[in-house]
Each structure stands twice: as structure tokens, then as C-alpha cells.
């Protein structure tokens, strides 16, 4: 394999640039040319592809977002769209592709593999919802962004003796909410993967207030419901002054943490190794600090789960 491509797809995550950098530098180290596909699968179809050199990825390891940009692409879901994308790759002599993104990006890589084009997926999403890896690129940075927000909100919550509901990202996965809630000392954590008892949450807040607690923090993953609605109900049923903060897209931005830069570098380089070994239809990950790879179809068919022992611990520590 003498030429490979790399693209970023779906929601951006801090560390994607570090992964792109690793792909380019690892490939060039092995005398393999690298082409960047801009705007994800949309760029594959439109032919927005250019050769990347060492200088192309200079000064990006510390930058958030993605140098290659990203976009949604409904056309790629069609056979015609995929065939057009593959034709553009073959026109340039590109023989394999590294896809950095979440489960939707993995689905695209799977489809390309089914068309006979070798792909390797690299998990890039702040949601940490890709099976087969302990952590995804961007999760640690997003987590630290949320923790920073919790700490600052706690200061004002204490000053005004208020309850705060903080809504974080996670439509289908509660990892950000769970980890941030545990690290931030939240009184309650609501995630899509676990049932919750609103009456118990209300009772716990009342008990805390009765014993002199000056503030409370509740973390809600967006997939559970609206933080605003939770805030209204809490204030109505507890008579405690309650405010809501929806963190939104700030969780996706910012300079990647050291952990995300290292993770992205390791996974990006490993993806190139797999392609050069002729292994397509795979995706990479990290488990127990060791690099691993899996069949991408198996990963797509595996349901993501949160660590139940951590969820239980969060309940035990929030009494």
C-alpha cells in the first residue's frame, strides 16, 4: 500500500487533529503518501481531496476541532454516493482509508469495506460511546471542560444557596454525565442507561436542605430529558431556588488534554499499521492501556454500556 487517505466525520472532538497528525507522520515514516479528505464523506463524494505533507500537520497537535473539517452527508448513505466516493479515491491511487469519528462514521467505513475498499476506524467522539475501547478521543477533554464548569457553577450556587441542574451532552450515552458527576461531587446523576426515581431525588434534596446543605448540583445527560424541565419540577416540589445551565457545544471545543493527545497519537498511528498489514474492516481502541483492534461490524452490533459499578458508587457517595 503506497497511498492512504484520512478523514474526520460526524461531531468533532478535541484530539482529532492529533490523530490526523499521527496518521500522516506514521505513514510518511513508512514511505506512504497520505491524502486528506475534507468535510468527511461529503468531501469523498465531491472530490475535495489533497495530498498532506509533514508541514500540513505542523502546529495542530494542540488545537481543538479538526483541520480536515467535518460534515453530515446523507448522499453517502446511497450506493451511488459511495461508489462515487470510491471512484474519487481510486482516481488518485488511494488504496486504504483511516476514518476518525463516532458510530455513524464507523457505519460509513463498514459500507466502504463492503464495497471492497479497506478502512480502519479510529474512535473520535466526546460521548465515549464506542464499544471495544475504554476511551474515545475527545472524552477526557470534554470531561475536564464539564468539571471546570461544575466547579465554577458550584461557587455561585454556594454564594446564593441554590440548587443547580447542569445539562451535559449525551443523547444515548451517559459517560460524560456519570464521570463528571462523580468527579464533581453531584448530588444526583441522570443518564439514559439507568432508570431514576424523581421522588427519591426530590426527597434527597429536601433531606440535604434540612441538615443545612447550602447548595446542590444535579447532572443530567441530554438524552434523559430537558434540564430546564427538571429544574422547574425541582423548584416546584422543593421550594428551593433552582437554576439551570445547559453547557452545550462548549464541551466539543478547546485544546485537547494531554491524555487525548497521547491517545489520539497512539490510535492514529496504529490505524496506519493495520492498513499497511492489509487489515481492512477493523477499528482500533485502547483497553487496559493496550492497543487493540476489532472487526468493525462486531463493534457496530455491540451495545454501549456504562460502568454500573461507577453509577452505583455515585449513588452511594451522594447521600
UniProtKB/Swiss-Prot annotation:
The keyword Metal-binding applies. Mg(2+) binds at residue 103. InterPro entries: ATP_PFK, ATP_PFK_prok-type, PFKA_ATP_prok, Phosphofructokinase_CS, Phosphofructokinase_dom, PKF_sf. It is an enzyme of class 2 (transferase). Signal peptide: none annotated. Allosterically activated by ADP and other diphosphonucleosides, and allosterically inhibited by phosphoenolpyruvate. It catalyses: beta-D-fructose 6-phosphate + ATP = beta-D-fructose 1,6-bisphosphate + ADP + H(+). GO terms for cellular component: 6-phosphofructokinase complex. Its cofactor is Mg(2+). Pfam families: PFK. Keywords: Allosteric enzyme, ATP-binding, Cytoplasm, Glycolysis, Kinase, Magnesium, Metal-binding, Nucleotide-binding, Transferase. Substrate binds at residues 125-127, 162, 169-171, 222, 243, 249-252. PROSITE patterns: PHOSPHOFRUCTOKINASE. Belongs to the phosphofructokinase type A (PFKA) family. ATP-dependent PFK group I subfamily. Prokaryotic clade 'B1' sub-subfamily. Catalyzes the phosphorylation of D-fructose 6-phosphate to fructose 1,6-bisphosphate by ATP, the first committing step of glycolysis. PANTHER family: ATP-DEPENDENT 6-PHOSPHOFRUCTOKINASE, PHOSPHOFRUCTOKINASE. Homotetramer. Component of a possible RNA degradosome complex composed of rny, rnjA, rnjB, pnp, pfkA and eno (although rnjA and rnjB's presence is unclear). Specifically interacts with RNase Y (rny, PubMed:21803996) and enolase (eno, PubMed:22198292). Interacts with BrxC. This is ATP-dependent 6-phosphofructokinase. It comes from Bacillus subtilis (strain 168). The gene is pfkA.
Amino acid at each position: 500500500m503506497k497511498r492512504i487517505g484520512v478523514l474526520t466525520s460526524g461531531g468533532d472532538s478535541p484530539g482529532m487533529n492529533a490523530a490526523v497528525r499521527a496518521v500522516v507522520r506514521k505513514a510518511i515514516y513508512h514511505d506512504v503518501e497520505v491524502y486528506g479528505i475534507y468535510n468527511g464523506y461529503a468531501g469523498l463524494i465531491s472530490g475535495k481531496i489533497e495530498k498532506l505533507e509533514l508541514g500540513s500537520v505542523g502546529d495542530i497537535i494542540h488545537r481543538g476541532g479538526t483541520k480536515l473539517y467535518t460534515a453530515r452527508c446523507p448522499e453517502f448513505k446511497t450506493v451511488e454516493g459511495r461508489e462515487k466516493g470510491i471512484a474519487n479515491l481510486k482516481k488518485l491511487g488511494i488504496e486504504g482509508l483511516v476514518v476518525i469519528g463516532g458510530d455513524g462514521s464507523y457505519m460509513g467505513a463498514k459500507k466502504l469495506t463492503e464495497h471492497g475498499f479497506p478502512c480502519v476506524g479510529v474512535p473520535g467522539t466526546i460521548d465515549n460511546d464506542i464499544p471495544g475501547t475504554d476511551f474515545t478521543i475527545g472524552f477526557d477533554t470534554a470531561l475536564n471542560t464539564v468539571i471546570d464548569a461544575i466547579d465554577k457553577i458550584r461557587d455561585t450556587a454556594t454564594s446564593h444557596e441554590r440548587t443547580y441542574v447542569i445539562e451535559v451532552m449525551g443523547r444515548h450515552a451517559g459517560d460524560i454525565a456519570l464521570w463528571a458527576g462523580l468527579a464533581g461531587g453531584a448530588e444526583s446523576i441522570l443518564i439514559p442507561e439507568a432508570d431514576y426515581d424523581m421522588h427519591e431525588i426530590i426527597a434527597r434534596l429536601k433531606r440535604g436542605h434540612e441538615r443545612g446543605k447550602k447548595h446542590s448540583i444535579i447532572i443530567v445527560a441530554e438524552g434523559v430529558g430537558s434540564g430546564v424541565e427538571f429544574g422547574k419540577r425541582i423548584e416546584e416540589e422543593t421550594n428551593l431556588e433552582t437554576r439551570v445551565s445547559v453547557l452545550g457545544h462548549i464541551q466539543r471545543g478547546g485544546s485537547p488534554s494531554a491524555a487525548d493527545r497521547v491517545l489520539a497519537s497512539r490510535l492514529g498511528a496504529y490505524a496506519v499499521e493495520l492498513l499497511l498489514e492489509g487489515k481492512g474492516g477493523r477499528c482500533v481502541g485502547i483497553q487496559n492501556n493496550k492497543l487493540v483492534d476489532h472487526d468493525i461490524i462486531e463493534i457496530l452490533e455491540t451495545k454501549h454500556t456504562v460502568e454500573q459499578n461507577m453509577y452505583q458508587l455515585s449513588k452511594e457517595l451522594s447521600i
